[in-house]
Amino acid sequence: MLRIAVPNKGMLSEPAWNMLAEAGYRLRSNPRQLVVEDPDNDVELFYLRPLDIAVYVGRGTIDVGITGHDLLVNSGTDAEEHMQLGFGASTFRFAAPNDSPITKLEDIEGKRVATTFDKLVHDYLVEHGINAETVHLDGAVESSVQLGVADLIADVVSTGTTLRNAGLRIFAEPLMHSEAVLIRSPRLEADDERLTILSRRLQGVLTAQRNVLMDYDIPVEKVSAAVDITPGFESPTISPLHDKQWAAVRVVVPKAKVNQLMDQLYEVGARGIIVTALQASRM
């Protein structure tokens, strides 16, 4: 069986579970379950701490896993990034107290930086020629400055609300941009059939999430103009209607552009324009 690690908690967990469910994999029915066998798909799911997933995959104990790009880099393991999964977008930033004189990267020299990602921060500071102490904490790093453990922090930022509520101010450029990724063990070949099937399914979910199915009727003489607006992946499906002066068009279009496309199609004569969500896909 293909052994797949998924986050058991945190911001990546629920989107990862949903994605696997939409890809047809069986999930746990009890939150206390740590391992789920899915014989129909020849996989085993292991619910692990997000911080540990890259370690297990890097050592070959687990074949593939879903984790954050930042967690992968910080792990320092041999696990390899296989594909981006389109959720969990975040940045990794420095933050200091609002009244702190620390306002730029150079000001970190000689300071204490609290973080869960000590390797990532250490490597970044060394790369920029800055000597500072990294203080490893397993969580809630935003409290470390107030408690006197550190002078500033480095942490994952999604909206920045938590930092602002803690009286912290973001400064300097992001250390890293991150999102959820599928990683694989160095012992698992990139063209392994089981990995190919998993990747194809996940890509199908991504495609379904980002696109919709659009149907509309168009006068025959306007078909070319309509196809220019909605060319689809390969080509739209065009079918004759009972009224020979009209044709029906079915095409996959980007979800983000639906309303603009509907406006453009209406302007060239399309009518009966409807949009349907996609559940799954293989493109």
Swiss-Prot record:
Nucleus found in the keyword field: no
Pathway: Amino-acid biosynthesis; L-histidine biosynthesis; L-histidine from 5-phospho-alpha-D-ribose 1-diphosphate: step 1/9
EC number of this enzyme: 2.4.2.17
InterPro entries xrefs: ATP-PRT_HisG_long (IPR020621), ATP_PRibTrfase_cat (IPR013820), ATP_PRibTrfase_CS (IPR018198), ATP_PRibTrfase_HisG (IPR001348), HisG_C (IPR013115), N-reg_PII-like_a/b (IPR011322), N-reg_PII/ATP_PRibTrfase_C (IPR015867)
One of the GO biological process terms: L-histidine biosynthetic process
Compartments, record wording: Cytoplasm
SUPFAM superfamilies (UniProt xref): GlnB-like, Periplasmic binding protein-like II
Catalyses which reaction(s): 1-(5-phospho-beta-D-ribosyl)-ATP + diphosphate = 5-phospho-alpha-D-ribose 1-diphosphate + ATP
GO cellular component: cytoplasm
Annotated Gene3D superfamilies: 3.30.70.120, Periplasmic binding protein-like II
Listed GO MF terms: ATP binding; ATP phosphoribosyltransferase activity; magnesium ion binding
Keyword Ribosomal protein in record: no
Function: Catalyzes the condensation of ATP and 5-phosphoribose 1-diphosphate to form N'-(5'-phosphoribosyl)-ATP (PR-ATP). Has a crucial role in the pathway because the rate of histidine biosynthesis seems to be controlled primarily by regulation of HisG enzymatic activity.
Alphabetized PANTHER family for the sequence: ATP PHOSPHORIBOSYLTRANSFERASE, ATP PHOSPHORIBOSYLTRANSFERASE ATP-PRTASE
Protein name per the record: ATP phosphoribosyltransferase
